[in-house]
């Protein structure tokens, strides 16, 4: 399902090269994911700088629209590290190499990985993260961000019954984390944590600091890319 890599490129921070190759991208979308034709046309015909600014407003403000998959499953749990290692091992099996700036659970990267698998395995991989895709799509749709269409398209390609509309009730009950007040609260919390960490750094070993960091963590459900996911 090579179209998954194209969808991943449309999901990433807008890149000049994609704008230069917009006719090729549109041709692939029309052929393999026609439900995204309007989205792709509107995206790639808009000024690049405008879309870059809009992308940052959508995906860089708060965690609830993060494109890091495990942010929505493990958050800061210690299980997140092992999940990263497991996913990285899956990438290495198909020859996918990451550079030092990439995290294995970055959704466009995961889509690139799925794009080299047989179609049935690629669909299974999408189904394994279908609840996350639906939730992200629902949050983006609530914020009137056009990228929600990408998540609905992925769910359609996977054959999932979920969509951005299927999580409307949950999304409406959530407190948004992209408001000025929410962002200020996160900043203040990080400042307090920074001060506390520095206060104990002189008389604590790295191991003790690590244990304190995770002492209150819980272990959320793991998104297993090798098992069947929600439909």
Curated annotation (Swiss-Prot):
One of its GO terms (biological process) is nitrate assimilation. Belongs to the NarJ/NarW family. GO terms for molecular function: metallochaperone activity; unfolded protein binding. It comes from the Bacteria. Pfam families: Nitrate_red_del. The gene is narW. It is found in: Cytoplasm. Chaperone required for proper molybdenum cofactor insertion and final assembly of the membrane-bound respiratory nitrate reductase 2. InterPro entries: DMSO/NO3_reduct_chaperone, NO3_reductase_chaperone_NarJ, TorD-like_sf. One of its GO terms (cellular component) is cytoplasm. This is Probable nitrate reductase molybdenum cofactor assembly chaperone NarW. Keywords: Chaperone, Cytoplasm, Nitrate assimilation. Its main location: cytoplasm.
């Amino acid at each position: 399902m090579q179209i998954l890599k194209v969808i991943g490129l449309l999901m990433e921070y807008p890149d000049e090269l994609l704008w230069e190759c917009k006719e090729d991208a549109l041709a692939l979308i029309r052929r393999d994911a026609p439900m995204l034709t309007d989205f792709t046309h509107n995206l790639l015909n808009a000024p690049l700088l405008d879309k870059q600014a809009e992308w940052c407003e959508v995906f860089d403000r708060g965690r609830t629209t993060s494109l890091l998959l495990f942010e929505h499953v493990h958050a800061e749990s210690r299980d997140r590290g092992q999940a990263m290692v497991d996913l990285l091992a899956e990438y290495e099996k198909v020859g996918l190499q990451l550079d030092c700036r990439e995290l294995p659970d970055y959704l466009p990267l995961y889509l690139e990985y799925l794009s080299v698998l047989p179609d049935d395995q690629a669909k299974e991989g999408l189904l394994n993260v279908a609840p996350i895709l639906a939730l992200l799509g629902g949050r983006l749709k609530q914020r009137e961000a056009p990228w929600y269409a990408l998540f609905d398209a992925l769910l359609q390609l996977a054959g999932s019954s979920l969509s951005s509309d299927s999580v409307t009730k949950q999304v409406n009950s959530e407190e948004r984390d992209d408001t000025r007040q929410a962002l200020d609260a996160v900043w203040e919390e990080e400042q307090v944590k920074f001060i506390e960490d520095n206060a104990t750094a002189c008389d604590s070993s790295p191991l003790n600091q690590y244990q304190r960091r995770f002492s209150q963590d819980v272990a959320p459900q793991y998104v297993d890319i090798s098992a069947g996911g929600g439909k």
